[in-house]
Amino acid sequence: MFVYYCKECFIMNKQQSKVRYSIRKVSIGILSISIGMFLALGMSNKAYADEIDKSKDFTRGYEQNVFAKSELNANKNTTKDKIKNEGAVKTSDTSLKLDNKSAISNGNEINQDIKISNTPKNSSQGNNLVINNNELTKEIKIANLEAQNSNQKKTNKVTNNYFGYYSFREAPKTQIYTVKKGDTLSAIALKYKTTVSNIQNTNNIANPNLIFIGQKLKVPMTPLVEPKPKTVSSNNKSNSNSSTLNYLKTLENRGWDFDGSYGWQCFDLVNVYWNHLYGHGLKGYGAKDIPYANNFNSEAKIYHNTPTFKAEPGDLVVFSGRFGGGYGHTAIVLNGDYDGKLMKFQSLDQNWNNGGWRKAEVAHKVVHNYENDMIFIRPFKKA
């Protein structure tokens, strides 16, 4: 019984040992697996971290590359007038360097590489990655060329604007005047609405009293306005009228035959007076033709009678064909407002009463009514 008991105990102990051994094996296995997984996980994390570091470095370089491209594009799209030919973008682990010094020299094409240097702290060996960025090279080339063109256009634009401004807003304000006989600087200055000193300074004239015939002077580009004729004062006008009346008084009470034909005609008296003023007689088949047969542009002014017209002493009055048997009549005015109502005037006449052809009617004073068809000729000269 004892033996049996011991045998049974031995068997039970053996079974318990197997169980413990199995548990130990399982524990060791689990531990080994755990250690293996731990080791595997640690290596994976390290590799993954290292890979991330490398990826970060590369990504950082790529982002800098993109940033450089975008910056160039921004410059191209906005200013297009300045591109930095030398620049460096640096980080702690990555350097991105763009060298464009030779990009536009001698018109050579740009062939530029971007070098990214990657040297992780935990790596004993540096890895160099060279990227041939043709797209960025092309962008830089275009940007540089466009910058050159833009600068050239700006230069041309400024030049064109300058000449346009000169042509349209700063055009020369002077013209050339040729000095004529009798000219003086003061007279020229008056004619062109400027001053003698201004003409002197413009033409470098030291002595304002010394100019020469044919000399070219720069004068202001202003419309020529001739000086207004001096108005004759009432005193001067009275003196002129007095001198005319004094001369006409010498013709009164005498018979005049200017052409030697048909006696003392009205036309003869007027021709004597006009010859005294201008040295020649007047043309016309009859007295009524005088205003149309002669050129009075430089000698007199012609007036047609109106209700407000007033003749002056020395004016010629021409009657229409209603008088003188169709030939008209002419006389020399002495008083243009004889009645004070502008209804009558007084003149010096000859042959008014048809006695001149017989030389029986001398020049004498006659009062006439103003007629609608009368014409008056006022000489510029006074007797």
From Swiss-Prot:
GO biological process: cell wall organization
Statement: the UniProt record of this protein carries the keyword Ubl conjugation: no
Gene Ontology MF, one: lytic endotransglycosylase activity
Domain of life: Bacteria
Keyword Phosphoprotein: no
Any Gene Ontology CC annotation: extracellular region
Cellular location(s): Secreted
Ranges for domain LysM: 175-219
Domain Peptidase C51 stretches: 241-378
Secretion signal span: 1-49
Main enzyme class: hydrolase
Alphabetically ordered keywords of this record: Cell wall biogenesis/degradation, Hydrolase, Secreted, Signal
Inducing stimuli: Repressed by MgrA.
Official protein name in the record: Probable cell wall hydrolase LytN
Organism: Staphylococcus aureus (strain NCTC 8325 / PS 47)
Source species taxonomy: Bacteria, Bacillati, Bacillota, Bacilli, Bacillales
